[in-house]
């Protein structure tokens, strides 16, 4: 008989979706089958509200080895190697249980990468919280950072960079996005396919418990009263187990016995089995009585929906089972044959002799509902506010100090010093610069990585904000001397059932796609996190873009810090009146308002070409993009460096704009570079049609900024450093 509305509510299914299940099965589903559909048809697993928009993104390119649809994307980097990378969200679990939520987010993205046969080389993160002046937000931040560091450090993968942003909109919905990069030979990439009828299905790794049941469903619902009491749905991670699992999986892959492999992440055994079968067009028979369990009395429903960590499902060639078992026994891990690949296209779940579920794999995956949800074009009244009409701040040195002390701009050393950024000895540029850089062992190459996003811009104008996010992520990679070769995205939004939220999403995806096409950067995969709302209040639309870039000669990698006195500093690109959505307007006037900067993608591409030519030729000593806080903040950051004050300088800013605009405008497509090859740089800039302005030379213990004969700012480096370290002082203070 049909189930009641209370059952559907608990499983986050609509009545229409239930009726669709009945049609697909030709009968009423049993309770276990309802559970399977609940997790597989969740937003988290099915992308049912986003798929129609994501299909428009550019996913192909000459370097793309694996695009969307697998555990991670992959791009060729030469020498028979591929960079494997992906970004994922763990927002909801991190709000409920910050340490474990963040830790298992790192664990999940690591498994996505080594499931492809790649050894993880680096992790980045993108974090967003409410204002750190609130004790609750500081506790969330501390828990998340400890979780990321605790898992990554113990596993032995360096956390090499990321971003931390503080905004009111993330007060009740922090964002925790993690990116992992690994390396693999292009001819040794593994995929999540249950191929070969008769082949054996193995369960490997940790035992199954009741943690994480309905984690995917929880991640597909907004928060309300009592959300913080959902700790049972948050998984518990064991990084030491994961490290052993990594080594065992990579060794098993080398035996040639493995046909396909997928980690048990969201939706656990249900997702891994049904997706592997659907991709291969096969069926899978599973006996959950053979699944290793750490709790007694677990039902088929609980075993199939558990999201216990550090588990994998793999398919081995029939007759090679002993080879697989031998490897995992060597590493003291469970490797239990729990089923076989069949030819009927169905997922059949047994508990001993009893049939608990019998569902077509395609019904759980390919035939999940796809919604073209209604949306309205975003029209934010705050975006039409004329911020240029606001009174100019009279104390420009004070504004610069205030911007450097702003939590989003201030030094994040308190965060990244809790991460091991150099384990495995591949890190060339760690946290604190525009992009992280890791070497590719056995070659002269290196890879640069960056995550970027600007929810403030996207709230004001989703289309333009998304274009700006892509451009800034690519620009940061270029500032490290790397050519962008691939991107991944994590799209964090509110409730897609609200037309205004869906409008934000549609325009964001459109902007992201347009920018990636213009800059020739394919998207190889990503993640969508909807329902980032509490009591109807949504976060800013926040697309986080992860970009990977290639440096042919690792010796040419750049950082953003001034190196030596006497080097000339150039501003590449022109400054315009771009204060909309800026840090200046937020810090000085207390508003998020105005039209975000308008991005010229042609100018952006020309800037990239110039900087890459100059970096590759060895003309540049440093490079830093101008973004939050404008050129004044960028110059201060170059002088401060990653670890403390270096040399300053006296710099004259070009143009006749109002002084506060000259200093703090956030016009895109600009970069600060230092060089001793001035003539060559100027000639190349002319050839690439990029404005090139000499600001001055590095030297002294003060930062002085002028406009013609007018002095705008004159501050000693010690004061700048004190302002820049304000966040560390706040976070290091004794807990209340």
Briefly describe each language-model feature range:
Residues 1-736:
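Glycine/proline-enriched, intrinsically flexible loops and inter-domain linkers
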């Amino acid at each position: 008989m049909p189930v009641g509305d209370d059952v559907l509510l608990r499983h986050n299914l609509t009545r229409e979706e239930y009726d669709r299940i009945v049609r697909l099965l030709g009968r009423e589903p049993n309770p276990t089958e309802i559970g399977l559909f609940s997790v597989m048809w969740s937003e988290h697993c099915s992308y049912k509200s986003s798929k129609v928009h994501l299909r428009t993104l550019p996913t192909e390119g000459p370097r793309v080895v694996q695009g969307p649809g697998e555990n991670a994307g992959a791009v060729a980097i030469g020498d028979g190697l591929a960079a494997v990378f992906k970004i994922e969200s763990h927002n909801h679990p991190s709000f409920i249980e910050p340490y474990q939520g963040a830790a298992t987010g790192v664990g999940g993205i690591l498994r996505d990468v080594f499931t492809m046969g790649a050894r993880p080389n680096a992790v980045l993160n993108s974090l967003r919280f409410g204002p750190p002046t609130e004790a609750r937000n500081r506790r969330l931040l501390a828990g998340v950072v400890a979780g990321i560091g605790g898992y990554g450090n113990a596993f032995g993968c360096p956390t090499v960079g990321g971003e931390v942003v503080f905004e009111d909109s993330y007060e009740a919905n922090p964002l925790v996005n993690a990116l992992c990069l690994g390396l693999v030979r292009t001819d040794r990439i593994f995929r999540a396919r249950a191929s070969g009828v008769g082949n054996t299905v193995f369960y490997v790794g940790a035992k199954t418990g009741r943690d994480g049941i309905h984690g995917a469903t929880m991640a597909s619902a907004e928060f309300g009263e009592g959300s913080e009491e959902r700790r049972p749905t948050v998984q518990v991670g064991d990084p030491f187990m994961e490290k052993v699992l990594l080594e065992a999986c990579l060794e098993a892959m080398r035996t040639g016995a493995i046909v396909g492999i997928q980690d048990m992440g969201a939706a656990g055994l249900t997702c891994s089995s049904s997706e592997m079968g659907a991709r291969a067009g096969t069926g899978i028979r599973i006996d959950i009585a053979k699944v290793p369990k750490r709790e007694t009395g677990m039902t088929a429903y609980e075993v199939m929906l558990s999201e216990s960590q550090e588990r994998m499902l793999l398919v081995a060639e029939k007759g090679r089972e002993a080879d697989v078992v031998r490897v995992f026994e060597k590493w003291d891990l469970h490797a239990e044959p729990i089923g076989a690949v069949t030819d009927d296209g169905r997922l059949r779940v047994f508990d001993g002799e009893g049939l608990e579920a019998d569902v077509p794999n395609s019904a759980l995956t390919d035939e999940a509902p796809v919604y073209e949800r209604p949306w309205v074009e975003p029209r934010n009244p705050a975006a039409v506010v004329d911020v240029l009409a606001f009174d100019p701040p009279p104390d420009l040195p004070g504004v610069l100090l205030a911007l450097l002390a702003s939590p989003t701009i201030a030094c994040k050393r308190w965060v990244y010093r809790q991460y091991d950024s150099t384990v495995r000895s591949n890190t060339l540029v760690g946290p604190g610069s525009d992009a992280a850089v890791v070497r590719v062992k056995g070659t002269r190459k290196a890879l640069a990585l960056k995550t970027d996003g600007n929810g403030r811009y996207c709230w004001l104008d989703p289309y333009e904000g998304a274009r700006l996010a892509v451009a800034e992520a690519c620009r940061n990679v270029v500032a490290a001397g790397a050519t962008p070769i691939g991107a991944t995205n994590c799209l964090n939004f509110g409730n897609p059932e609200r037309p205004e939220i869906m409008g934000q999403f549609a325009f964001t995806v459109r902007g992201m796609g347009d920018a990636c096409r213009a800059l020739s950067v394919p998207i190889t995969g990503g993640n969508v996190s909807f329902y980032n709302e509490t009591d109807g209040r949504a976060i800013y639309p926040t697309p986080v873009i992860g970009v990977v870039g290639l440096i042919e000669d690792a010796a040419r990698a750049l950082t953003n810090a001034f190196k030596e006195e006497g080097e000339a500093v150039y501003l590449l690109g022109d400054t315009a009146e771009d204060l909309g959505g800026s840090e200046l307007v937020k810090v000085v006037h207390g508003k998020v308002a105005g039209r975000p900067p308008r991005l010229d993608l042609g100018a952006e591409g020309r800037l990239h070409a110039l900087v890459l030519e100059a970096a590759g030729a060895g003309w540049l000593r440093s490079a830093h993009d101008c973004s939050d806080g404008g050129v004044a903040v960028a110059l201060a950051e170059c002088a401060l460096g990653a670890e403390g004050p270096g040399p300053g300088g006296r710099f004259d800013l070009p143009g006749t704009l109002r002084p506060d605009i000259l200093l703090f405008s956030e016009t895109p497509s600009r970069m600060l570079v230092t060089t001793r090859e001035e003539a060559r740089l100027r000639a190349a800039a002319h050839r690439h049609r990029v404005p090139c302005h000499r600001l001055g030379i590095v030297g002294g213990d003060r930062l002085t900024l002028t406009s013609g004969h007018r002095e705008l700012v004159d501050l000693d480096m010690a004061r700048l450093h004190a302002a820049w370290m304000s966040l560390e002082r706040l976070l290091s203070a004794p807990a209340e």
